[in-house]
Structures are given as structure tokens and as C-alpha cells.
Amino acid sequence: MLRSRVPANIRAFDAFPKFSKEYRRQSSSRGGFFTILLSVLIVVLVFSQCVQYIRGIREQELFIYDSVSELMDLNIDITIAMPCSNLRIDVVDRTKDLVLATEALTLEEAFIKDMPTSSTIYKNDRYAGLRWARTEKFRKKNNAEPGSGTACRIYGQLVVNRVNGQLHITAPGWGYGRSNIPFHSLNFTHYIEELSFGEYYPALVNALDGHYGHANDHPFAFQYYLSVLPTSYKSSFRSFETNQYSLTENSVVRQLGFGSLPPGIFIDYDLEPLAVRVVDKHPNVASTLLRILAISGGLITVASWIERVYSSRAHRSTSEADMLGLLGKSETE
């Protein structure tokens, strides 16, 4: 009864007007897909920027090495399948200086069965360098008693002249006069865990680190030719001078007889006149956050444009279908 007393124009008044159906936003699975895709992209972006912030950006440049330095360190850690008493280690350089490395290095008894092989090295080193797991320059000692080992681990640091030279590991007497080591005792199968020049840097993996060499015969010779490149490293935490090198290798069976070259392991190193400077730069927190926000905003804007284009196309297709339906209905009538 009260409704009949209200004027018609007041009854028609609506404080919350209804939109026409064609302007209403229809829910669809497409919007959910775009939301999930955009969320995944933003998460990947944030993760990549965090990784870049932690690792930093590495820049390298070449320059002429003009520093004057007379000496450098030679770091070595090698295991050879021969007793220590059957080995001799020397370093000779272009100035004809001879370093009796047998006395300067540590020779430690080991066992052949404990030496890594090419298959075990590949299995353990597929995903990471051998040196990444080590924090000390040289690992702990073996458990072999003196005189009981079938192999010899040679490790330590030598101070040599900063000129071209050669480190050679041979058997006493072979190539230096009358041999006192039996022929059948020669076995220069070896595993090089560490060979570097300059200050020790665990993150720098050189070409001979983790290298395995198998001797196919008793009078076997391994020849390694190294091109040593001085390297200057600088980061936010430290800076130092070290070296890295490239490798060319060759192996051959020596011919026995007077005047023949001795079997063994020969490492020739040549110093390059060029040097490389490595600089690690870490972006600050503010620039990283601004970069994340800028790229995230760009992704959201592009995603909204794409969604709007798809929505307009879908709306146009729906309108055309409705129009065709109305025309068909009118023709039928």
C-alpha cells in the first residue's frame, strides 16, 4: 500500500545505477593465466637481480705488463705413482739458475690405489672445480708410513726467478749419468691437484688443476708447455697480483740409449708480456631495488596492454556473434 503512494519518478530513482551489459567486465581464465605468468616473471627477475648483487659484475681488460718483479711463487701439489726415493725434482730457468726442489718441497709417501683416475675425476668434477671445496692451500697428509708407500705426493711452494724456466720430475740417474733406478720401476702416471704461479687464489682454476696423466710405458715422458699471463685481481674486499696460464701438452715414449732424453714430467713455463686486469664490481642496494621496481613496472604495464588487446578482441568477437544471431532471428521471423 505504501509503495502505491510513492510517485513513479521516485520509485524509478536508483542511487547505484546499473551498467549496461556490454560494459561489464566478464571474468575469464585468461586473466588468471596472465596473473600467474606475471608473478613467475617477477619472481625470476627478483632472484636474478639478487644473484647479480651477490656475485657482482666481472670486468676484464688487457694491458702491457710493466711491473718490475724479480721473483714469483710456484705452487705445486702432485702425486706420482712411484716411491719418493725414486724421484728427483729440479727447476732450471733461462738464467741457468738451478733450484733443487727435492729439498725445498715436501715429499710424502702415498698409495697408488688412492690416486684419482680419469674416470673418478670426471665423476667428482662434473659440476664444480676441484679447488672450490678446499679452503687451505694444501690438503691434509696421507696415512702412509715412511718407506711403505707405492706413490709419492709432492707439494709445497717454490720461489723462482720471474723468467722462463722448466720444472722437471725425473728418476735419479736417468739423463744425469749412470741410472740406479730399475727400468721396470719407472711409472710416471700422475695426478696434478694444484699447479699455479703467484699468490694462491682458490677461485682461480688453472688448466692443470685436477689433471690426470697415465703412462703407457715405463720410459714415458709428459711435456707441458705453459703460457703464463700475469693477472691483477681487484674487488671490494681485496686486491692482489697472481698469474694464470694456458696449456699445450704432449706425451712420448723415450728411446733408450746413450744421449737419449730422459723419461719424466717436464713443465715448461713462458711469461707473457701482456697482463690481464680483473675487477669485480658489486652494485649498491639502492640501484638494485630501483632496477627491480623499474623492470617489474614495465612487465606489469606490458602485461596489462596484452590483456587489454585480448579482451577487446574477445569482446568484438562476442558482439559480432550476437549481431549475427539477431539478424538470423529477424530473418526467420
UniProtKB/Swiss-Prot annotation:
GO terms for cellular component: COPII-coated ER to Golgi transport vesicle; cytoplasm; endoplasmic reticulum; endoplasmic reticulum membrane; endoplasmic reticulum-Golgi intermediate compartment membrane; Golgi apparatus; Golgi membrane. InterPro entries: Erv, Erv_C, Erv_N. The keyword Endoplasmic reticulum applies. Keywords: Endoplasmic reticulum, ER-Golgi transport, Glycoprotein, Golgi apparatus, Membrane, Phosphoprotein, Protein transport, Transmembrane, Transmembrane helix, Transport. Glycans are attached at residue 187. It comes from the Eukaryota. The keyword Protein transport applies. The modification Phosphoserine is found at residues 317, 319. Signal peptide: none annotated. It is a multi-pass membrane protein. Residues 52-285 are lumenal. Residues 1-30, 307-333 are cytoplasmic. Pfam families: COPIIcoated_ERV, ERGIC_N. It is found in: Endoplasmic reticulum membrane; Golgi apparatus membrane; Endoplasmic reticulum-Golgi intermediate compartment membrane. The chain crosses the membrane at residues 31-51, 286-306. Belongs to the ERGIC family. Constituent of COPII-coated endoplasmic reticulum-derived transport vesicles. Required for efficient transport of a subset of secretory proteins to the Golgi. Facilitates retrograde transport from the Golgi to the endoplasmic reticulum. PANTHER family: ENDOPLASMIC RETICULUM-GOLGI INTERMEDIATE COMPARTMENT PROTEIN (PTHR10984), ER-DERIVED VESICLES PROTEIN ERV41 (PTHR10984:SF81). This is ER-derived vesicles protein 41. It comes from Schizosaccharomyces pombe (strain 972 / ATCC 24843) (Fission yeast). The gene is erv41.
